[in-house]
């Protein structure tokens, strides 16, 4: 299991402990990827997981670029369309730094 997969598993477990329900992992489209798809009450939650072992090059949150946010939004829109979902959604980020988990709800 790669570090990215380990971080996604850790994030998924953490979010499930917080009351979210797991739907799908690593949804890939030619134009973008969604790390985790979760549900929280009536919302579908698209989660980007960022891992950094140390923040010497900036923390996990700083690793998320505007271009990457655009690709995630496009992938989420496509996901909702292909699954015929007309539901509220949000974009969360789970940042894992030095074994600490930071969950940013509605991050972008």
Swiss-Prot record:
UniProt xrefs under Gene3D superfamilies: 3.40.1350.10
Q: Which domain of life is it from?
A: Bacteria
One GO MF term, please? Answer: nucleic acid binding
Q: Which NCBIfam families match?
A: PRK12497.1-3, YraN family protein
Q: Which family does it belong to?
A: Belongs to the UPF0102 family.
PANTHER family assigned: UPF0102 PROTEIN YRAN (PTHR34039:SF1)
Q: What is this protein called?
A: UPF0102 protein Shewmr7_0260
